[in-house]
Amino acid sequence: MNIMKKISLALALCCASFYSMADQLPLGGFSYGPVEAPTGKEWESPENLALNKEQPHAYIFPFQDVESARKVLPENSKFWQSLDGDWKFNWAPDPDSRPKDFYKTEFDVSGWDNIPVPSSWNIYGVQKDGSLKYGVPIYVNQPVIFQHKVAVDDWRGGVMRTPPANWTTYKHRNEVGSFRRNFEIPQDWDGREVFISFDGVDSFFYLWINGQYVGFSKNSRNTANFNITPYLRKGTNVVAAEVYR
């Protein structure tokens, strides 16, 4: 069974003074409010789509002046910062093997691999000798890659059920990629709200800033924006994303 999943994180810090979309009546499956830590089961429930993720909206980018705004692209704004590039990365074949405390600022990731973001970790892990460092690339255009039945409420059985032994996911039931990097907020962003934008994460992720739990997002290929203003500090900040295949 040849199946593939692509993970790509395209990230940007977007600083703006516009109001939070969370003030509107949220869509079903979106929830808001302070939560100290995830339960670890959010990725198994189709009823829970997001925590503290901004409501879907058109692309919004602030600019410092009209001339910059006429150039349209966000990189022409001093209130936009890209987080694309090398991130510290750890690959685990299943959720139980993941480094559970990696989001804590005191957790040492200096020995981790670097991985370019955005990228597919499966493809990036293909070595020159043909060996696979980060799991098996899976290609499929319609069937789901985990064991299931077409039946009402079958989702309650979860994605970790044992599939046939000839399935690629028999060995790597649900891979987890742990991503971390540092960033700094420009001084002239003081007094503004700061949002982080993920332009596509497949298929689920938790987010922490400076060791504090921000929320989670499903819906792999849609943009996920979070207001991270309350979690920021002056100087170096740490962003951590835990991605489930």
Spell out what each predicted region is.
Residues 1-3:
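Short, Lys/Arg-enriched N-terminal segments with co-localized hydrophobic residues
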Residues 209-245:
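Beta-strand-rich ligand-recognition modules
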